[in-house]
Amino acid sequence: MSDIACIEAREIIDSRGNPTVEVDVSLSDGSFGRACVPSGASTGEFEALEMRDGDKERYNGKGVLKAVGTVNTLIADTLEGMDALNQGEIDHAMRNLDGTDNKSKLGANAMLGVSMACARAAADFLGVPLYRYLGGVHTFRMPVPMANIINGGKHSDNKIDFQEFMVMPIGAASMREAVRMTAEVFHALKGLLAADGKATSVGDEGGFAPDLDNEQALEYIMKAIAKAGLAPRKDVCIALDCASSELFDEGDRRGYKFWKSNPGKLFTAQEMIDLYKKWIATYPIVSIEDPLDQNDWAGYVQLTKELGDKVQIVGDDFFVTNTGRLARGIKEGSCNSILIKLNQIGTVTETVDAVRMAQNAGYAAVISHRSGETEDAFIADLAVALETGQIKTGSMSRSDRVAKYNQLMRIEEELGAQARYYGAKTFERFGC
């Protein structure tokens, strides 16, 4: 039987040394699923709420024993006996039990751990891979990686204001080749930085964190692509996560400041747009994430009008994997893509709903990790299951990041000749 027999949570540690929630779900026939919940550093104002203990004497207040207790009592009492194959009903039951818009009663971290673990247990019961259980029998598309190779913003202690500088191996013929190309650019960049006396230590997501200015980061990536024997734009493109809500001046709310490199200058939304235009014309940039503040709806409409046919504009903090915010963005013409983070919304079902809404509207969807990760590679299966065609899961270092790439290569091997890596076709509408 596929009935849920036992749900048990525990506190574990994520890649930043902070506590997070791990959940085990056992079914009545012995089938089993386990999931670990990620956590973000740069978080959107409208994300579902993580439940933290707030006890400053323990993990600086970041413990998750309350969330663990919630899983082991309220959630377990509600879900035990339900059919694990009914993912929608399980997630709906937790949402009803919570009763809030932002998951503040149970905590999104508690709910997500259970939701993911139930999906894994159901897949185990059916004897199918997780991607097959979530996506059905016709899912063969492998995602193009967005690999973070230079960290800035909140993810590092350097002077780079923008949070992530990433490479996308669009010229690869397979997932395995995409990983190889990305790794070779990563190592080429390390060599260039070391030769110039720059730091080669890595940030939260495995990318390097040298003390450069924003445009120098782009220049180094261009050199690394060439040093790896690859061609910019043909083989490898660049993607940015600007995390501009972190740059927005909350004091007078008039514009943006490069707090690390040039805190004395204030940039308007139009000046930010003009900067992106300049960079897009100069570098092989194919995707820009969170280019403006999460509350700047008018700015996003204008930016999309000016750049939406030239580059992928990804809403992360702007959409927070929330179908309500996404529906408004679609209606108003804001962005043309959404970043998908499971813990921004708190259940697998709501995550799938957001992806399907985006795809039905002609928006791209990019499955994403968080800066605080674990060895759990759920998002690798999710990207294949939902055929999003893109995944953002960090650099070619740190086992918490590499775990996802390794899982994608395993999936590709399992799919064999049926596997499809679209590469440049993913960005055909932007001239790639």
Curated annotation (Swiss-Prot):
Q: Where does (2R)-2-phosphoglycerate bind?
A: 163, 341, 370-371, 392
Q: Please tell me where this protein is predominantly located.
A: cytoplasm
Quick check: keyword Transcription regulation in the entry?
Answer: no
Subcellular localization: Cytoplasm; Secreted; Cell surface
Q: What class of enzyme is it?
A: lyase
Per the Swiss-Prot or TrEMBL record, the active site comprises 205 (proton donor), 341 (proton acceptor)
Query: A Gene Ontology MF term for this entry?
Result: phosphopyruvate hydratase activity
Q: GO cellular-component terms in the record?
A: cell surface; extracellular region; phosphopyruvate hydratase complex
Q: Where does Mg(2+) bind?
A: 241, 289, 316
Q: Might you give the EC number(s) for this enzyme? A: 4.2.1.11
Catalytic reaction annotation? (2R)-2-phosphoglycerate = phosphoenolpyruvate + H2O
Protein function: Catalyzes the reversible conversion of 2-phosphoglycerate (2-PG) into phosphoenolpyruvate (PEP). It is essential for the degradation of carbohydrates via glycolysis.
Question: What is the recorded name of this protein?
Answer: Enolase
Q: Which organism is it from?
A: Treponema pallidum (strain Nichols)
Q: Which gene encodes it?
A: eno
